[in-house]
Amino acid sequence: MSWIIFYTVIAALLVLDLGIVHKKNTVMSFKESVLFSLFYFVIACLFGIYFYYNTGAEHAREYYTCFLIEKAMSLDNIFVISIIFQFFKIPGKYQHRVLFFGIIGVIIFRAIMIYGGTILINKFAWLLYIFAVILIATGIKTFYVSHKTFDIQNSYIYKSIVKNLNITPNLEGDKFVVKRNNKLYFTPLFISLVLIEAIDLVFAIDSIPAIFAITNDVYIIYTSNIFAILGLRALFFCLAEIVERFSYIKYSLALILIFIGFKIFIHHYIAIPAYVSLIVTITLLLFGIIASIIRKNMIDH
């Protein structure tokens, strides 16, 4: 029943998104982007309340912790998506269409990764320690790397697509595929969609281990993942500016990853409750936001 409720909510949001709000190809304004993202955030928070009343406070805390971590870890994804759109010269009026269909892929591929990860961890518990090492290493690396980059032309995926598929040199309106001389040709819109899906899988390799350190409940992990990503896609059109403004969030995220990594190593000796993980996550993110605001004000003045 819980899965039916979740997928009903997601289906309704997707129909509202593309079928009503963005039925025509138009560029989303900054204000619309913020309002739509806030709408998704409220829905995600309400789903946490659903957890609270149906499965208890502990599950609700785990859900909110997973949601915040996934939200923070997905920020770099925005920069890579922006690079892809710039490379293929995708106009703003078509970007939302690509992001929308990208969500469909995310819903499918994240389900496979999370379900597969749960099976592996239940069978090989020691995998969590490998995840812990990855998280600590990623956290330390985050201190020294500004943003993740993506060399499109030299990527294996791009080379494979160009080599094996018929590609149109230019966009064909909002179409992903066109037919010419009884042959299918794929447009730059399609290639950008495939690359965005591939990049999401790469970023998921970083974020999903962090979530498994909080809980091994598939429903909590999956729902928090999807709601976090839905909100970020809605905020894409203004997020680059916001992330630049909150430049210290990456350091908060680095500390969160290191904290989660150590939490895995010590869980046999000290059990850290879900509410502590939630408090640590919120506190570190708030420190990052406040420090960024103070820094921005000092630079402006």
UniProtKB/Swiss-Prot annotation:
Membrane topology: Multi-pass membrane protein
Pfam families: TerC
InterPro entries, per the entry: Integral_membrane_TerC, Integral_membrane_TerC_rswitch
Domain of life where this protein originates: Bacteria
Localization terms from the record: Cell membrane
GO cellular component, one term: plasma membrane
Record's keyword terms, sorted: Cell membrane, Membrane, Transmembrane, Transmembrane helix
Stretches of the chain forming a coiled coil according to its record: none
TM stretches of this protein: 1-21, 33-53, 72-92, 101-121, 124-144, 185-205, 220-240, 246-266, 270-290
NCBIfam families in the record: R_switched_Alx
Family: Belongs to the TerC family.
Name assigned to this protein: Uncharacterized membrane protein RF_1252
Organism: Rickettsia felis (strain ATCC VR-1525 / URRWXCal2) (Rickettsia azadi)
